[in-house]
Regions:
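Membrane-interfacial segments
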Residues: 59-67, 100-105, 191-203
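Hydrophobic, aromatic-rich alpha-helical transmembrane segments
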Residues: 34-37, 72, 76, 80, ...
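N-terminal transmembrane-helix/juxtamembrane module of multi-pass inner/ER membrane proteins
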Residues: 1-51, 94-122, 199, 203-214
Length: 214
């Protein structure tokens, strides 16, 4: 646990969800240590799960090489292959938004005890990059593999909640992060779906393993 408070030079920032943030961090402070440890580990390393799900989605989307008449197979594989790039675009949009909005972390402006150490000044809060990435990954999986999405969607919500629990984000930071992740990734996946049928041509090139199993 780390006690934090804002020096006078930071000003006095107030948001509508200050009370909710303080209540969550107080609950985290009073919770058993093992629970806080698990939430902290998920908050720090949980994005790796989304990377694994994206990889699994691409692997599952590739049709067998023998399925020569499955025209949609390479298209599905190509769509899954573009998914990580879509998530990266969502992250880039989030990073630009952070630099423009320049909202300070709640642990820098409120006197609270947090599970994680408060990020340094200049590490902006709005929107939550973790929430953006998780929501974008869940969205692209909804477009490519509903079974994996059934795991990714609740995992994205848990990722967003964990960022508030450990004290590094306001609730509105993660809420906006989820919205940004969906709004950026969904139209990009729609556009990618229109171009995906061109992937059939890759089956006749050395790039065939990208869209079909050997």
């Amino acid at each position: 646990m780390t006690a934090t408070g804002a020096p006078a030079l930071l000003g006095d920032d107030h948001w509508f969800d200050d009370g909710l943030y303080s209540a969550v961090t107080e609950l985290a402070h009073r919770s058993p240590g093992p629970l806080d440890t698990m939430v902290s580990l998920w908050s720090a390393y949980g994005l790796a799960l989304f990377g694994a799900l994206l990889l699994a989605g691409w692997w599952r989307a590739r049709p067998p090489a023998s399925a020569t008449r499955d025209a949609g197979g390479p298209a599905r594989a190509m769509l899954a292959l573009t998914a990580p790039a879509v998530v990266l675009v969502a992250f880039a949009v989030s990073s630009v938004a952070k630099s423009l909005l320049r909202e300070r972390r709640p642990c820098q402006t409120l006197h609270v005890v947090t599970v994680e150490a408060c990020p340094a000044l200049g590490d902006w809060s709005l929107p939550s990059n973790h929430a953006v990435i998780a929501a974008a990954a869940a969205t692209v999986l909804l477009c490519t593999d509903r079974r994996l999405a059934a795991l990714a969607v609740p995992a994205a919500l848990l990722m967003a909640a964990s960022r508030v629990w450990v004290g590094v984000h306001y609730p509105h930071d993660v809420a906006l992060g989820l919205v940004v992740g969906v709004l950026v990734s969904w139209p990009l996946m729609v556009a990618a779906r229109r171009a995906a049928p061109l992937a059939g041509r890759l089956r006749e090139t050395r790039l065939r393993p990208l869209v079909a199993r050997r």
